[in-house]
Amino acid sequence: LNCELNEVLNNLDVCAKQISEKYNCVTVLKSHKTVVTSLNGEIYHNTTGNSALAKAGSGDVLAGMISGLIAQGMSIFDASVLGVYLHGLAGDLAKNDLSAYGVLASDTIRYIPLSIKNYLCKNINVF
């Protein structure tokens, strides 16, 4: 994008769209307010997650979640949206039990089943 970090942080939607257009891809732009953009301009603003996810390995957990959803037949955009939501929810649940300071990526993994259960039981629509 050839711009400064502050420009990206202040323009997440625009920057994510530019990446999707430039590279013809779905973009997951991680931040304190994660944004997912599609090839045709759809934008999803994630509502879950917290500072507990700002740890080494957290992005790897997210990538694995998105990949697993794609492997189950979801579109890349839908898998990215749901993966980001569930990953953030797992982080929220872990933070509630362990504190933001004590959560490791491995803890987030342990909370994924509970985040899926909450998503299914509460009939949440992220799409």
Residue spans of the language-model regions?
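Short, small-residue alpha-helix embedded
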Residues: 55-86
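Short acidic (Asp/Glu) and glycine-rich catalytic loops that position anionic groups and cofactors
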Residues: 44-46, 63, 87-91
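Short pre-catalytic strand/loop immediately N-terminal to key active-site residues, enriched for Gly-Thr
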Residues: 44-56
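Glycine-rich phosphate/dinucleotide-binding loop and adjoining beta-alpha-beta core of small-molecule
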Residues: 1-45, 121, 127
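Short, charged, surface-exposed loops that flank catalytic or proteolytic processing sites
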Residues: 3-12, 73-78, 99-103
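Short, well-structured alpha-helical segments that form the helix of a local strand-helix-strand
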Residues: 12-20, 76-90, 105-113
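Charged C-terminal helix
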Residues: 91-127
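Acidic, glycine-rich active-site loops and adjacent beta-strand->loop/helix elements
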Residues: 33-34, 50-52, 84-90
